[in-house]
């Protein structure tokens, strides 16, 4: 099992601009790396709420956080229901919200959950095994070649979606993650197999996003998060691929009325009109060279920050 190191930890804590007495939400608890650092910075009057779909993650995080403070409450649920999950606890406004969108909670290192292309396991990939009946097995073994191709292209941005989909259908039945990896490899040219990135990464990403409806969930949650912020409250989002980036960028830019247009003489105009929100940083923050060396999970990570005026 990899040692889990939180991605962009110092940067996200810095830009969350934590107030001693504030109320904060970690929407992606995972192994509580970010949550621990938030909790350390709160006084006895501050409070942390943290959300995760995974019961195992909740249990492990509880033990870790209790060593720091008791000023927290862990919620098992999907952050698409952010407002409702907080309302149940009589919370209707907060000072900061954090999203770490990387799959870094315990599921990734447990083969039986089916998320890993390095550890053998069943074709599952459900974040919420209680309420979601759609598994990777269903897609891989029952969906049409065209449907699979569309999923891989749309959600994995996989250039070889067509050849991979064709090979998957020809290789059925496919019963495990590592068997799927071999099928994917057999569909790719040698030049791709020699690249640094794992050849199955994009396919597994596509399946995971589709099964868990991740993009719509993120969009819905961010809109709720904006409504929950107190004045000077901030949202920090750590993204890991261009599909997430596009959603965050669109929502943040539209919320701040931040735009760029071209005049007839090709001079760009940038404006931040009167708005409830402002972009704290105009361009997302990327990991330092040191972090990239020490934490392979940080590759492609970007931090985005917005503040309510």
Swiss-Prot record:
Entry's EC annotation: 2.1.1.199
Residues the record lists as binding S-adenosyl-L-methionine: 32-34, 52, 79, 100, 107
GO biological process, alphabetically ordered: rRNA base methylation
Keywords: Cytoplasm, Methyltransferase, rRNA processing, S-adenosyl-L-methionine, Transferase
Keyword Repeat: no
Pfam families reported in the protein's UniProt record: Methyltransf_5 (PF01795)
Domain of life according to the entry: Bacteria
UniProt family annotation: Belongs to the methyltransferase superfamily. RsmH family.
Name the UniProt record assigns to this protein: Ribosomal RNA small subunit methyltransferase H
Native species: Mycoplasma capricolum subsp. capricolum (strain California kid / ATCC 27343 / NCTC 10154)
Annotated gene: rsmH
């Amino acid at each position: 099992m990899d040692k889990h190191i939180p991605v962009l930890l110092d940067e996200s804590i810095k830009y969350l601009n934590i107030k001693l007495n504030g109320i904060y939400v970690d929407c992606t608890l995972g192994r509580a790396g970010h949550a621990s650092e938030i909790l350390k910075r709160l006084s006895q009057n501050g409070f942390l709420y943290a959300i995760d779909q995974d019961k195992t993650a909740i249990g492990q995080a509880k033990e870790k956080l209790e060593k720091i403070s008791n000023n927290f409450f862990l919620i098992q649920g999907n952050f698409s229901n952010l407002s409702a999950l907080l309302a149940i606890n009589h919370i209707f406004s907060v000072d900061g919200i954090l999203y770490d969108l990387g799959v870094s909670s315990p599921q990734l290192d447990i083969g039986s959950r089916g998320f890993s292309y390095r550890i053998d396991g069943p074709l599952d990939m459900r974040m919420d095994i209680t309420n979601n009946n759609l598994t990777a097995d269903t897609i891989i073994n029952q969906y049409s070649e065209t449907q699979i191709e569309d999923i891989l292209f749309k959600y994995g941005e996989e250039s070889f979606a067509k050849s991979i989909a064709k090979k998957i259908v020809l290789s059925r039945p496919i019963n495990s993650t590592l068997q799927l990896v071999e099928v994917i490899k057999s569909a790719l040219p040698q030049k791709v197999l020699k690249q640094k990135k794992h050849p199955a990464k994009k396919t597994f990403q596509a399946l995971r996003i589709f099964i868990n409806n991740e993009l719509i969930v993120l969009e819905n949650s961010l809109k709720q998060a904006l409504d929950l912020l107190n004045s000077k409250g901030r949202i920090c989002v750590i993204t890991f691929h261009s599909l997430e980036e596009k959603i965050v960028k669109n929502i943040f830019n539209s919320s701040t009325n931040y735009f760029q247009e071209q005049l007839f003489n090709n001079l760009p105009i940038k404006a931040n009109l009167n708005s409830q929100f402002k972009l704290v940083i105009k361009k997302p923050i990327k990991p330092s060279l040191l972090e990239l060396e020490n934490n392979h999970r940080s590759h492609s990570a970007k931090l985005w920050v917005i503040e309510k005026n």
